[in-house]
A protein has these predicted regions:
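Bacterial signal peptide processing site
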Residues: 15-17
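Bacterial N-terminal signal peptides that target proteins for export
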Residues: 1-5
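Terminal, regulation- and interaction-focused segments at domain boundaries
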Residues: 28-47, 90
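Glycine-rich, aromatic-bearing surface loops/beta-hairpins
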Residues: 20-28
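Mature extracytoplasmic domains of secretory-pathway proteins
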Residues: 49-87, 93-100
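Helix-rich interaction surfaces within compact, conserved domain-sized segments
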Residues: 82-133
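C-terminal motif of bacterial Sec signal peptides marking the signal peptidase cleavage site
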Residues: 10-13
Length: 133
């Protein structure tokens, strides 16, 4: 029993602990979502459609603030062909939220995009960080 306890204590010491944030900053999750604008069978998502999506879906979900960037991505498909696509990149800094909570908050937004614009997926990235204002 003592040996098992000793091993557990050693393993606990190896577990990663979050680094302390600098003075004036606190723990946050940074979330990014990449919304592709190509739509099969029709013209790409327009700027007006994006603005409407922001007003109706994104802003109510994240009223404290966000950043949107224009992006242009590419990937190689199964046939080896490079496909390119314009996108909108949504960046969220969510103070005091862990990655699971951030993912849960963002999921309805990405689901709405996929449904509205017949998208297969929305790339999402979550990472821990520090934020201060």
């Amino acid at each position: 029993m003592k040996a098992a306890l000793g091993v557990l204590l050693l393993l606990a010491g190896c577990a990663a602990t979050p680094e302390a944030c600098p003075t004036g900053a606190g723990q946050a999750t940074i979330a990014e979502a990449y919304f592709g604008r190509n739509v099969k069978g029709r013209a790409p998502v327009t700027d007006a459609e994006w603005v409407h999506f922001m007003q109706e879906i994104v802003t109510p979900a994240f009223p404290d603030g966000l950043t949107v960037l224009d992006g242009n991505g590419q990937w190689r498909n199964a046939a080896g062909r490079i496909s390119r696509e314009d996108s909108k990149v949504l960046v969220l800094v969510l103070p005091g939220q862990d990655q699971a909570a951030a993912s849960a908050r963002l999921a309805p937004v990405t689901a709405a995009w996929k449904t509205r614009f017949a998208q297969e997926s929305v790339l999402t990235v979550f990472r821990a960080g520090c934020a201060g204002f």
